Amino acid sequence: MVDRETRRLSFGSVAADYDRYRPSPPPQALDWLIPAGAAAVLDLAAGTGAVTREIMARTPRPARVVAVEPDARMRAVLAARCPGAEVLEGQGEAIPLPDASVDAVLISAAWHWLDPERAVPEITRVLRVGGTLGVIWTSRDDRVPWVAEFNALARESREADRARQGFSGRRRREVTFPPGTPMSPPAERRVTFSLPMTSEQLAGLLGTYSGVITLDPERRADFSRRVRAFLDRQPWDQVDLPMICRCLRSTRLPG
């Protein structure tokens, strides 16, 4: 049986593909999440640096961009792809930064891997008063019929994996704080956008999710065949993939 910690760190085994196929959030999302004039921004659970690169591309660029990631294999790609960022080993439950040292903490596609009881106090500790926590989920827009069918393939694999490993319930998609936490109630914004994707890129994207990575070789090969069969039925080899970026923003309060 693959435990949750193994799943959480499974992405490093496909770090190059993760970097190649996982989408970045649109710039409009970061514009809303990062406070004006932010001098120091932390990308927490940074993966291979998709959000880190977006932060560094901003004008004006924050004077300090820090990326914290627990997996050494992901950090190696991150460091190579994000020269100029400060890349550190660490995790949300133990952030290797001093108190009140950053103006924004961004967490993309990773909130569900954190333990909020331990991570929230760490996030509030490193945030300056007036700074923001931004949590990002970027997902495919299944209001489009072919995307709904494509998502069903991914969901089937994930649910089979959860049943096999003894997991239950939906991934955590809300941000809540314990009573007394000096953070404002989260505000929400959604940004729609699209990405040009080839069939090969779509197949590669599904291969970067933990539910697929941790399948045994036989099940993974069967999953790949079904994905390829679905893509071969489509009347295109390249398509604009509709996406939704859901953002939650909370401000660090005094206290």
Show the residue positions of the predicted features.
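Conserved class I S-adenosyl-L-methionine
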Residues: 1-37
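Class I SAM-dependent methyltransferase SAM/SAH-binding core
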Residues: 40, 48-94
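Conserved beta-strand/loop positions that form the S-adenosyl-L-methionine
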Residues: 44
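A short acidic, Gly/Pro-enriched loop at the edge of an enzyme's catalytic core
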Residues: 93-104
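A short SAM/SAH-binding and catalytic strip from SAM-dependent methyltransferases
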Residues: 103-117
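Conserved catalytic/acceptor-binding region of the Class I
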Residues: 118-195
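Conserved Class I S-adenosyl-L-methionine
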Residues: 172-255
